[in-house]
Amino acid sequence: MVQSAVLGFPRIGPNRELKKATEGYWNGKITVDELFKVGKDLRTQNWKLQKEAGVDIIPSNDFSFYDQVLDLSLLFNVIPDRYTKYDLSPIDTLFAMGRGLQRKATETEKAVDVTALEMVKWFDSNYHYVRPTFSKTTQFKLNGQKPVDEFLEAKELGIHTRPVLLGPVSYLFLGKADKDSLDLEPLSLLEQLLPLYTEILSKLASAGATEVQIDEPVLVLDLPANAQAAIKKAYTYFGEQSNLPKITLATYFGTVVPNLDAIKGLPVAALHVDFVRAPEQFDEVVAAIGNKQTLSVGIVDGRNIWKNDFKKSSAIVNKAIEKLGADRVVVATSSSLLHTPVDLNNETKLDAEIKGFFSFATQKLDEVVVITKNVSGQDVAAALEANAKSVESRGKSKFIHDAAVKARVASIDEKMSTRAAPFEQRLPEQQKVFNLPLFPTTTIGSFPQTKDIRINRNKFNKGTISAEEYEKFINSEIEKVIRFQEEIGLDVLVHGEPERNDMVQYFGEQINGYAFTVNGWVQSYGSRYVRPPIIVGDLSRPKAMSVKESVYAQSITSKPVKGMLTGPITCLRWSFPRDDVDQKTQAMQLALALRDEVNDLEAAGIKVIQVDEPALREGLPLREGTERSAYYTWAAEAFRVATSGVANKTQIHSHFCYSDLDPNHIKALDADVVSIEFSKKDDANYIAEFKNYPNHIGLGLFDIHSPRIPSKDEFIAKISTILKSYPAEKFWVNPDCGLKTRGWEETRLSLTHMVEAAKYFREQYKN
């Protein structure tokens, strides 16, 4: 009989209960026991929801207070020495590794000052994981038994679950060697790590687990030979052990075909494959399945919010049943549902027609179950009919098509994506306008979003204050930020973005073709959640979006103020995109909307315009090849279409987060100045790659995701390291990213120390 399965469910709670609890704990407002109770309540709620929906195979150990990869590092004792010396509790160690910790000594606790581990994008999603850091002194051992405890927790509720673990090869491959052990190959630690996996799996079996889901998402990457060999070695090893639960080897986000040789013949009970992202792999995967293995068909999209087409999905599952038999097929989500909002029923303000196009995590449970029942011959005719009508109505919807937008995209030519002169000719004109010192200082855009800002925005949205009152409040906040920047001596200022709720949502709300949720939160990292806008139809800008605030900010200072925009690729990648139009087309529509805004800012007297692209690397296809090179070409073109309509003397900036970007790809954007998140890299080789980069650059100097405050000496040391490989005359001094999530006191001190460090180097380079 065909079974239904879910690979993971959002951990945040329908009303962001996890965020409120973790931040409450960090701020000392709740105890650790109260935090743990919230976690237990959320897990219970998720398991019961899936059970009541009729899901056969329900995941456990998909919950985390911060990040599932970080949980594994704590479980296996992959904890760098800088954390262990403080004798923190396990949960405080977890949080210190994720976000850093800086606290003064008290009567009961000693002082702590430790930076966070590196945070990296989870494949091509907008989720971030905390990267495991290995050294030659890493000693694997079990710290607790979280997967077992959560399995038993569900068992007490009468719910039999399938525990989820990130696999050993993916865990090692996605990690890195510590800076003191750079010659260490993480995969060389596999033999030491496998016994710990076996120990956890044995404990799970003893607790009553009959099956486990082991995720090896690296199987959709271009794996080197040693990683493919590691897959064979790891799962052959598991197959040689006795009394372990059956293993479902799970992959997602792409095709496994290039790595099928590593998968064939493995002693695993089932293979899960993502047929949403890579339906073309079906025949080769089915041919590679062993005679007794089950195929888990990932057919309900774990990454996007569009309603499933039951007819198409059922056809794919039936094809698998024809090849393998019903007992060897599972209907599943393509990946964990972590990447989707929790429940569409919480959306009360969406247009009814548009709402009918969507399916959030809770609704996706029903989709998995309906498809399973349909292919099993059960009567779901009413559900199939309603689904078919919904799918058809979306294709005909008035919200989808705009002929004028399509015509404008078709008219894009090379001239529209080329600045009037090359950088070496633009630079002297810009220097004449700005007369900036060596080591110019700036920030990336946002300043702290205080409680007062959120309260007033909420009042305005509810209509309890007028537009005039709200504008007056926003202007007062802008003035505070401008005066602060002048006071500490920053060179190129920002207005602080107090009017913006989110860097994509703010613009999306002013662009035709977008839809927005009230409660469609998705975890980005830790307690940082986002509400991705939804691209429903063709995109266009009806009027100026940011000019008013930028003009006001520039009017109250003699220093240059940057106009701040979010780039076309980031607007695309940090939205739920359409699935009926290719992403290049959507990017070009956004580029044209932003081009109009850039030109309006310049016409209004804004001389520095920053178009942020923190998601540029995220959009890259996971595998090398023509798709990847094509992506870089059209992504760079979209940026240039947005920014190339300005005069030579107008300075274009851009910014990238979490990005291992090739300098040549950044060069293709032709921005005058770029800033890159860098504070947690400590990578001299990466700096050296930019030695011959022709334009100006700022490598981020402090981690804005951590409350920790770097000293002036730390800034000096970091800049000194950079200047060994990068020319001083091209270097800008800036933080990693925007300061929206930080408090004012830590912002004030960190930026003051940063400016003091820049002034120190100006003295050093005077002659």
Swiss-Prot record:
Superkingdom: Eukaryota
Instruction: Indicate which residues the UniProt annotation says bind Zn(2+).
Output: 655, 657, 677, 737
Under Enzyme Commission nomenclature, its number is: 2.1.1.14
Pfam families referenced in this protein's UniProt entry, alphabetically: Meth_synt_1, Meth_synt_2
Q: Which UniProt keywords apply?
A: Amino-acid biosynthesis, Metal-binding, Methionine biosynthesis, Methyltransferase, Phosphoprotein, Transferase, Zinc
Official protein name in the record: 5-methyltetrahydropteroyltriglutamate--homocysteine methyltransferase
Q: Which InterPro entries match?
A: Cbl-indep_Met_Synth_N (IPR013215), Cobalamin-indep_Met_synthase (IPR006276), Met_Synth_C/arc (IPR002629), UROD/MetE-like_sf (IPR038071)
What this protein catalyses is: 5-methyltetrahydropteroyltri-L-glutamate + L-homocysteine = tetrahydropteroyltri-L-glutamate + L-methionine
In this chain, where does the modification Phosphothreonine occur? 566
**Function recorded in the entry:** Catalyzes the transfer of a methyl group from 5-methyltetrahydrofolate to homocysteine resulting in methionine formation.
Task: Please provide, alphabetically and separated by semicolons, the GO molecular function terms listed in this UniProt record.
Answer: 5-methyltetrahydropteroyltriglutamate-homocysteine S-methyltransferase activity; zinc ion binding
What SUPFAM superfamilies does the record point to? UROD/MetE-like
Which GO CC terms are listed, alphabetically?
cytoplasm; plasma membrane
Q: Where is the active site?
A: 705 (proton donor)
Name the gene for this chain.
MET6
Q: Quick one: which pathway?
A: Amino-acid biosynthesis; L-methionine biosynthesis via de novo pathway; L-methionine from L-homocysteine (MetE route): step 1/1
Protein residues bound to 5-methyltetrahydropteroyltri-L-glutamate: 19, 126, 502, 525, 528-529, 574
Protein residues bound to L-methionine = 444-446, 497, 612
Enumerate the cofactors the protein uses. Zn(2+)
One biological-process term from Gene Ontology? methylation
The remark listed among the other comments is: Present with 264000 molecules/cell in log phase SD medium.
Residues carrying Phosphoserine: 89, 242, 629, 706
NCBIfam families the UniProt entry points to: met_syn_B12ind (TIGR01371), PRK05222.1 (NF003556)
Q: What transmembrane ranges does the database entry give?
A: none
- Give the family per the record: Belongs to the vitamin-B12 independent methionine synthase family.
Residue numbers binding L-homocysteine: 444-446, 497, 612
